Amino acid sequence: MTITERIDAITSIEPLRAHAIAPVPRAVKIELTGRCNFACAFCARDMRLRDQKDMDKGLFRQLVREMRGAGVEELGLFYLGESFMVPWLPEAVAYAKQDCGYPYVFLTTNGSLALPERVRACMRAGLDSLKFSYNFADAEQFSDVAGVKPRYFEAIKANIRAARRIRDEENHACGLYASYIEYDGVQGERMQQALDEIRPYVDEIYALPLYSQADLVSGEEDMRGWSAVAGNRGRAAALRDPLPCWAVFTEGHVTWDGKLSACCFDHDGRFHMGDLTREGFAEAWNSEIFQSLRRAHLAGDVSGTVCEGCAAYR
């Protein structure tokens, strides 16, 4: 199954999942860290609306084992932060893959810290998928939007090339992918030229719309002349209807401090549906507050819920 097929399967709400009491999701993203070394203008993380720390290793092990026992099959070792900042990332991959038996363990990175030896360790631990978020046309734009030194742009490209070399030399089964934000006009043309540089080194490249991050960064995007898609409607070539939002039904999101969130962009904690340090994953997944939110989504009216502020529902 390709990465886009997996994404489309998760962003499509199967009839059996379209209920207030929903089956345990097939996929969960768990946040090893809330930290990131970038300060991207299109991401609300840099607004620092919550504490940004690393997950306790013991809590990680507890939750990952519990979720696998509950029936979760696909585990993303990231959420809102950059997981390559965590020293024990390869150990986390090994624990999920080898000790807990997840069929599919995946990771998304900005690429700057995905150094060859770190990537090698993750692949040897059993990583199934490594995706690079590649959103900039050149070093100048990269520095302006990501808020970091321009030299990292070339470093990211070098890391992508190295990842392909390591995978091929050691015959790992890890898929290598890249996503980019889909722009139109001149920026769109520039992005395609930039993507051509990395295209030989990845298995698949796909586009994502520019998100408003639960309407937290829409002002910044408007100021820069960017046109954002509200909510999380999946990838650009297979946009989903904004209501009901798939994230409420098909994929779990666990923060570094053990909160279960209903949103892909929970930068301020308003979408917390349960505390996994106090209750089980299956229990929190169908908590009363989560059930109530799902009913609103199924009814097509999220006014009065935590989701009403998202521009998708205005």
Features from the language model and the residues they span:
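Conserved alpha-helical substructure of the radical SAM core
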Residues: 2-129, 145-154, 158
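Processing junctions and N-termini across compartments
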Residues: 30, 34-37, 239, 301-304
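Local cysteine-cluster metal-coordination motifs and their immediate loop/turn environment
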Residues: 37-45, 262-265, 304-313
